[in-house]
Amino acid sequence: MKKLLLLILAVMTVQLNAQDLAHYKKIVKELSSAKYQGRGYAEDGANKAGKWIAKEFAKVGADEVTCQPFKLNINTFPGKMDVRVDGKKLTPGVDFTLREFNPGLKGEFKLYYVDMENFDAEKMYADLASPEYQGAMVVCDFMFTYKHTEAFRKLASKKDCSNAGMVYTWEEPLKFYKAYGEVVREKPILWVKPDFPKNAKTIKVNMENKFLQDYECFNVIAKVEGNRHDSCYVFTAHYDHLGKLGKKTFYPGAHDNASGTAAIITFAAHYAKNKPEFDMYFIAFSGEDANLRGSDWYVEHPIVPLSQIKFLFNLDMIADNNPKQYCEFNDVAMEGYALFEKI
């Protein structure tokens, strides 16, 4: 444990020299660039980034670099993404975003606004079954739906309700996820900003999705040999991100998580020049924003036996300057927590 705590201290307090910091920033800039289209699965962005990461590990002096392939199912949005409300065009990622499980949808639809002050689920169902609103898009505050989960769940089924989809206003900054993108559901959900019109008449959409079945991606595993090989330390970070929302919009993911990926490459470069006591492994996971698929696959198919790992550091979203840094330990690692607080 003494050696473990010394390693934690070294990792947490090491001062990067100017050359290391410049290299770190260069990696973040590279992985956030348009050539990787948000490191998602449309246009093979994640795999292009993974190939670059593998080359970079080799370039900085890693003794071994391995690509560990696995497959996943994932929904993507690389095509048309046009939304207009009463003729006014909305900008993807700015005025609206989608749920990751959305199907494609094309057409012009009436808007049905839920009466949240006098909410009556049965009346809502009756309205949506009427000739006036049959096939409409339903507009409601997202948090309101949480209070009436069962009532709104029915709107997601074509069998139970004829609405074309849902438009949810949200007070929070608009978010785009991948965690539930392994399936495509029956109806689309759009998230829009709170300033979405309160009395618009129609919404015209042309949204294309592309579902990738058994898409092959890979983890990148680099090893820097130490003096001892009976156990090891592991640094991990995921390199995939959210990818594209239409043809022109992509999420660069500098913070989440080019920052963590750049850190483990920088650490690999350090240990390649300064031979450690134990073997060091640096794992860049893919499929992480898509429900932890890369790390799950590694646990099931470890390159090095999990029992030989003395300690694992996972670096995620480390590029902000928030004075409150968040660190999470499992029960086994709690002995190091007091030292972390002290640092």
Regions found by a protein language model. Name each.
Residues 1-22:
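Bacterial Sec-dependent N-terminal signal peptides
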Residues 20-36, 41, 52-60, 64, ...:
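Catalytic-core environment of secreted peptidases
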Residues 276, 285-343:
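Metal-dependent peptidase/peptidase-like ectodomains
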Residues 37-137, 141-142, 146:
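Noncatalytic luminal/extracellular "stalk/propeptide" segments of secretory-pathway proteins
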Residues 143-144, 171-173, 239-241, 284-291, ...:
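Acidic, glycine-rich active-site loops and adjacent beta-strand->loop/helix elements
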Residues 76-78, 146-153, 174-179, 243-247, ...:
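Extracytoplasmic/secreted cell-surface and envelope-processing proteins
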Residues 103-111, 116-122, 170-253, 269, ...:
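Soluble metallo-hydrolase cores and metallopeptidase-like ectodomains found primarily
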Residues 26, 133-137, 161-165, 229-233, ...:
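Loop/turn elements at helix/coil->beta-strand transitions in domains of secreted/extracellular proteins
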